[in-house]
Amino acid sequence: MSNLTRVLVVDDSALARMVISRRVSLDPGIEVVGVAFDGIDALEKVKNLRPDVVTLDVEMPRMDGLTTLSRIMAECPTAVVMLSRLTEEDAEVTIKALEAGAVDFFLKPSMLDKGGLSKAIAGLNDKIKMAAKVDISRVVRALRSGMPYYRGAGSFFPSSAKTGGLPLQKNVVIIGSSTGGPKALCEIVPHLPRDIPASILIVQHMPMGFTRSLARRLGQLSQVEVREAAYGDKLKAGQALVAPGNYHLVVGGADEVSLNQDPARNGVRPSIDTTMESVALHAGYRCIGVILTGMGSDGKEGAAAIKKSGGRVIVQDEPTSVIYGMPRSVVECGFADKVLPLSQITQEIVEMCKTRAANSPWRELDACGT
């Protein structure tokens, strides 16, 4: 029994509680230790039952999912997987929940679709088992010591005034993330200066609709312009484009973005590898790749392409990663130039861009031993 993942299912729908708890408990590696009908009930049961993982509905009476999550993380920190509907409102709340400490989220399946339900529950079980492996103390540390969000007006690049606010030389920063990524992105992107001499591409493993909410949330917090990428967008310094869910984002001639639905890579679409490889081919040594927290190895091949083109790769370190799978895959292959805690990554991006703005190619720096 000690090897089982102990789960508390929280949902205001009696049907959802019954179906989810019964289906999840069919997995031999999972034990459903209880169910709760709202946030107040959930708080009491989290404290009494001490589950490894809580599945938490977004919309509930008396105490909603976001408030319940905040209370759980403050009073009895536990790995939480949010259950969200594919609606704009739920997507907005889910993004905030991932900032507030939720480990992951899962699209809530229809309780009446028996055919799709079995497949969906299998996916939920995978999320539950992954969440159980998370060191929740890392999440708590990130919540307590995370950098404050701001919309500062400061400039790190005085020379940009000569170019109407945008630098002449343009780097391309590609940030890839998965599990734990939204919280990490909210600690990096808001601190990038508005006149950074780089265009930024963000690839976060998320479904369609949720990436739009993520872009909107980052835009609310940031100095740079942030929005979901659209076909035909142009790379522009001081702008961050988020790859839309279910589409690969690639960059071609004339700094133009295109989207496609080619087969998933590493089981995901959008793929970090796909975006990084296209940018490495297009921008060469002007690439800066950033690999953040996430499961699996997406980004490893992209990092290899960036290194081959003469670019640089920054990787989030293990202590600040919710899941160290993607960063580890890059580090173990020797593709990481810098392995840094989350709090230092923004400054490293800025420093690399400063170097490029000063017209000093990486290869010349490396020859000097810097």
Predicted regions and their residues:
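Conserved acid/base catalytic micro-environments in cytosolic active-site loops
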Residues: 2-8, 14-29, 35, 40-41, ...
